[in-house]
Amino acid sequence: MKKIICLFPFLLAACTTLPTSSEYLLRGDGYFKDGHAGKAVQSYTKALKLNPDNLEGYASRGAVYFFLGEYDLAEADFLRVLQDNPYQVDAYTAYASTLAAKGDFENALSVLNLASGLKPDKVEIFFSRGGVNFMLDRYEDAVRDYTSVINLHPAAEVYNARGAVYMKMGKTDLAEKDFNTAKTAKIPEKLNIYSMVD
């Protein structure tokens, strides 16, 4: 009995040093930030083995899969998030980006339209939808989406994107105006969409 009692503190200490699902998520975030995408995927997968209901783990792993060009795996992870939380707007935009990367622009547009119905003032949705509309040669819709972004959070990359649409439409004066605004205005160069995550 004394042996069991003596071993108990060691067992307890060993249990407290085992990484949790949250710790694996943090490790994955660190690995990805440091440019080690493969290790990030491994950490997120370990987090999900410990807690298969951890939607943040699926979303994070899906983002890394997307970065790696593993679009089918990314799509599966984003769909898993949406299965459990159909109101997760960021998962819709990530899923739509995956569809667009696979060349499925019509379905990407449908997903983004659904997301905009859930959160009509989310800049990332308009920016993504503008790009999809551009790829579908729906230039008026692309201009409308990019203008919505500019009205909410002006950034040089959005002016450049809208300028590219105007060029395709043959509206070179408007295109030049947007390109010049992107160069000279005191606005951020890029949208910081990650600071807008819900």
PLM regions with names:
Residues 26, 60, 67, 94, ...:
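Canonical tetratricopeptide repeat
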